[in-house]
Amino acid sequence: MNFGTMTFYTILFIIAVLLLLARLPIIGFYIRAVYYGLCLMIGGFVGGIASIPYGKSANNHFRMFKIFQFMTWPMGIEFELRNAEILNDEKPYIIIANHQSALDVLGMSYAWPVNCIVMLKSSLRYFPGFNLCAYLCESVYINRFSKEKAHKTVDSTLHEIVSKKRKVWIYPEGTRNANNELATFKKGAFILAKQANIPIVPCVFSTHKFFYNQAEKKLTGGKCIIDILPEVDSSKFETVDELSTHCRNIMQQHRYKLDAEAANLNL
């Protein structure tokens, strides 16, 4: 048996063992979680390399997202996007979404508007592969632990909105939250909307719990609903707090509705 044949059968054996191990709940969870992380790294790196000839552009996201969706297809996670036409508005707006887990990166790829940048926590600039794509997609990093740096980020993002008519994707909870109740919203997204005098577009994802649960070591195939709600006119609210509270309330109520629907979809 020559070296090539041995290598081929060795690879087949490893794949077979991994497939068998993946059927064990806990081991399967870690295999799928590692696979998803690799998809993020490789998808971001390949998407980044493919985007170099085009230079820095917010629309490089679509190249990376297509690669990422293709790579994660074997995981069996499906997203149903509703009211997508709201995203097609050419004017700038802030899109806010609830943030549950790392799977939100895959979810956002199905609801991404043209000429949009994302505000990311600063630690992600060190995530291999992903950071290259984020750089070429003109993503914005925000330091949540430094008010001074956070304010500078908000100011630079405001300039992007005004000068390039950008849309900005923000997770107002500020961190992952797998609970049924949305966390208290941070003010950054709403300050931006008020200062730029642009609307807010709420984006609500149904719960991931039917296919992903960190505590239970569960990561399987499943279905998630993404619903784009009508835009909220920021100019109709006197204060940032009023705007933030209103947006959180409508998103929370809609989240309950979507979770009930998702329960039936994931039977």
Positions of predicted regions on the chain:
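Membrane-anchoring hydrophobic helices of lipid-metabolizing enzymes
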Residues: F8-Y93
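Non-catalytic C-terminal accessory region of glycerolipid acyltransferases
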Residues: F8-I11, H151-L267
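Short amphipathic alpha-helical segments and helix-helix/interface helices
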Residues: F68-Q69, M108, N131, L158, ...
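Hydrophobic structural segments
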Residues: F3-T7
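Short acidic-hydrophobic, aromatic-tinged amphipathic segments that line or gate anion-handling sites
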Residues: L81, V140-N143, S234
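Catalytic core of membrane glycerolipid acyltransferases/transacylases, capturing the structured
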Residues: L40-R63, P74-M75, D89-K147
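Generic preference for hydrophobic
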Residues: L81, I95, V118-M119, I226-I228
